[in-house]
Amino acid sequence: MKLSQLLERLQYEVIQGSDQIEISTLINDSRKAEEGAVFVCISGAVSDGHRFAREVAEKGASALIVEKEVDVPGDVTVIRMQDTRYALALMSAAYFGYPAEKLKIIGITGTKGKTTTTYMIKSILEDVGHKVGLIGTIEAVIGEKKIPAANTTPESYTIHQYFAEMVEAGCDSVVMEVSSQGLMLHRTAGIPFEIGIFTNLGHDHIGPNEHKDFEDYKRCKGLLFKQCRLGIANIDDPWYEDVFRGADCRVE
């Protein structure tokens, strides 16, 4: 696959090298570096992928996706983006052949009730004949396979990997939990949700490692409703109007 194919839905600047090179795999973990890989440098809460740019290049990576300057050999392609987390999401979709576009995806967000709601919807859809995948706090379910979950909403690469496996397994629908962290960190960027569901909002997840304040928490929850066709609101929740403010979807 050419690097340019992974970048086709992104705006970017070629700092050195060429976007026409062939790449072997897409990674954002420096420990997985290999010959021909494209490495997406992400600045995280614990470490900054840009610090490992030279190490990854020395292991044979062909290209780096960066937000900051990096010092690597001239034969390594360097592509600069405004937001590498967002880039990883769209590149992952391209890498797996845009599997989300072959599925009807329902996303559930809210402080409480996401897990229960996903299993209820999965059961209802299966009862009327759909084959349904699931991604959530407890596990991902792909056909008969169950994969224990590390995060409520996995990293974008993993999400699209699961979507691709679901398509291969014959699924036509997916129900997934969408956390505020997942939305804030662009893990779900570019996913065409058919339906977004809001359960409720409480004062959890406020702190230095999550959301700086309740306003930020509300704003991040609302991001789901900028990328779905239909939003379903729990109007008994006092914050539902704030969450849906600025929504781009039809709301019921």
Regions found by a protein language model. Name each.
Residues 71-75, 169, 194-252:
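Acidic, Mg2+-coordinating active-site environments of NTP-dependent enzymes
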Residues 146-156, 204-212:
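Flexible beta-alpha connector loops of hexameric P-loop NTPases
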Residues 33-34, 68-76, 141-143, 186-192, ...:
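Short loop/helix-cap segments at secondary-structure boundaries that form the rim of catalytic
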Residues 6, 37, 56, 91, ...:
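Residue-level signal for inorganic ion chemistry
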Residues 150-179:
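Conserved nucleotide-sensing/catalytic segment adjacent to the nucleotide-binding pocket
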Residues 1-90, 226:
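N-terminal leader/targeting and accessory segments in enzymes
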Residues 93-139, 145-146:
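Walker A (P-loop) phosphate-binding motif
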